[in-house]
Amino acid sequence: STNQAAIENAHMNPFLLITFTVIMAPIVEELVFRGLLMGRVFNPDSIVGLIVSSLLFGLVHMPNSIGVWIVYAGMGLALGIAYRKFQKLEYCIMAHIINNSIAVSMLLLLQFLAPYIK
C-alpha cells in the first residue's frame, strides 16, 4: 500500500517508527473505528457498523490495489468481529498492536539484513 511504502522509504528512526506505528496508530485507529464508529455511531452489534468500519479501515491505509485494500479491510473486519464479540476496546487495541509489531519487526529485520543480502 501507499501507507506501507511511505513507512519503508522514510528510513525513520526505529524508536519513532515503533512509537507511531506500533503504539499510537493502533490506539487512535481502534478508538476511531471500533470505539467511535462501531461503539457510538452504530450499535456495537450492528452488521452495518461492522461493514462500514471495516471498509473505511481499509481505505485509510491508502491501498494501491484492490488486493491490498482487501487485506486491510480484512484486518478491520477481524478487529470488528472481536469488538462485537467481546465489546472490549482494549482487546482490539492489543490485537492491533501485535499485528503492527510483527509487521514493523519484519521491516526492521529486512532493513538490517539488506546490506548482507545483495
Describe the function of each predicted region.
Residues A25-I27, G58, I93, I97:
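Hydrophobic transmembrane-helix microenvironments that flank and shape a buried ionizable site
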Residues V28-V52, I81-Y91:
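Membrane-interface helix/loop boundary segments of multi-pass membrane proteins
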Residues L59-G67:
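Membrane-interface helix caps and helix-loop-helix hairpins in membrane proteins
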Residues S1-A25, L113-K118:
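Juxtamembrane helix-loop-helix connectors linking adjacent transmembrane helices
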Residues I66-K118:
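Functionally important transmembrane alpha-helices
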Residues F15-T19, I47-V52, W69-A73, E90-M94:
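Hydrophobic alpha-helical transmembrane segments
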Residues V32, L50-V60, M75-L77:
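Hydrophobic, membrane-inserted alpha-helices
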Residues L16-A25, E29, V52, L56, ...:
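Hydrophobic alpha-helical transmembrane segments of multipass integral membrane proteins
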